Design a protein with these regions (language model features):
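N-terminal hydrophobic signal/anchor transmembrane helix of membrane proteins
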Residues: 1-40, 125-136, 252-254
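Hydrophobic, membrane-embedded alpha-helices of multi-pass small-molecule transporters
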Residues: 6-28, 41-45, 49-53, 82-86, ...
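Membrane helical hairpin/interfacial module
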Residues: 24-111
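Structural signal for the C-terminal ends of transmembrane alpha-helices
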Residues: 57-62, 123-130, 154-158, 202-209
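Membrane-interface helix-boundary motifs at transmembrane edges
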Residues: 63-73, 129-136, 205-218, 296-303
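Small-residue-rich segments of transmembrane alpha-helices in multi-pass membrane proteins
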Residues: 74-83, 139-155, 223-229
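Membrane-interface loop-to-helix entry segments
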Residues: 97, 101, 111-112, 124-154
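Membrane-interface interhelical connector segments
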Residues: 238-269
Length: 305
């Protein structure tokens, strides 16, 4: 059904998932998962997402031709739900990025103009399945290494606070809020609900000689959960559970206090922000891509705008 040169590998699928989720998760997601309750929510929520991704992967045959296996009305209904999800997410994202860039990157520029530039940058990316896979594979390697090193520096420089907040003495004197933990599980599962879109694209993942353990989205979900957990711990160390009430971006406030060895670069937060903004551009590009791709799967042609 698909030409071999129009397929991607599981590794490229993982990189697309991680690159698209990283920016939004670290900027707006992790403040909801501070404290031990948030950490438990991430871990249990990650397990639930892995189980759900396994169920979705078994539906690959159905999504090769939804109209054939489900019928026209059910296929259109499912596609309509996902299209609504993409439109709402895209609109929310464009507004948030305009505000973020105006506050942290360039001041004095109208947020509407910044949002427009963001949209044009996302539209300028490749819309071809295989090209997007290669772009994500290369970009994720750079983003993961650079972002990981900066987060590691932040953790090392906050190590005394880490011991104080997560030490045994603190755990003994603080109760565990199970109700908040359950809410965190629900929030994390809701955040990861977008993996359902990957089901539409897995039909174009080629059957190669990759090891079975690389198939499916479980490795990507596991890595993403580690990123969330690291960011949430750093926010807990610096702001406690008050990160959700902050008017600023908590993770960027943490990175603003990070100093590189030798002190040759003082604005580490701008490097970290650049990584996250690139992730957000890729995410919006993915929204445009899937809005057209899902429609194509049910034999409807729509413009990207």
């Amino acid at each position: 059904m698909f030409a071999e040169n129009n397929r991607i590998s599981w590794s490229q699928m993982h990189c697309q998932c991680l690159l698209a989720a990283l920016g939004m998760g670290l900027i707006w997601g992790i403040p909801e998962f501070t404290g031990r309750e948030g950490a438990v929510g991430i871990l249990i929520g990650g397990v639930l997402l892995v189980l759900w991704s396994g169920i979705l992967r078994r539906q690959m045959t159905v999504f090769r031709d939804p109209i054939r296996y489900l019928g026209k009305v059910p296929a259109w209904l499912i596609a309509g739900i996902w299209e609504s999800y993409l439109v709402l997410t895209g609109g929310w994202l464009v507004g948030k990025v305009g505000h973020l860039a105006g506050e942290y990157l360039v001041s004095g520029v109208p947020e509407t103009l910044l949002s427009l530039i963001f949209v044009l940058a996302a539209l300028g990316g490749s819309h071809h399945v295989q090209a997007r896979g290669r772009l994500a594979q290369i970009s994720w390697g750079v983003a993961a290494w650079l972002g990981g090193i900066l987060l590691l520096l932040a953790a090392v420089q906050n190590s005394p606070s880490l011991e104080m907040v997560w030490g045994d003495q603190h755990l003994e004197t603080t109760g565990f809020d199970w109700k908040r933990s359950v809410k965190s599980i629900g929030k994390y599962v809701a955040y990861g609900s977008g993996i359902g879109l990957m089901t539409w694209l897995t039909v174009q993942v080629r059957d190669s000689k990759e090891k079975r353990r690389k198939e499916g989205l479980a490795p990507a979900i596991g890595q993403l959960s580690l990123w969330f957990l690291t960011g949430a711990v750093l926010l807990t160390v610096n702001f406690g559970t008050d990160a959700t009430t902050m008017n600023t971006c908590p993770i960027l406030e943490v990175m603003a206090g990070v100093e590189l060895p030798g002190g040759f670069l003082r604005r580490v937060d701008l490097i970290f922000l650049s990584i996250l903004l690139f992730s957000l551009v890729f995410l919006l590009g993915s929204i445009f891509f899937y809005s057209n791709y899902v429609a194509d799967r049910i034999h409807i042609s729509i413009g990207r705008l």
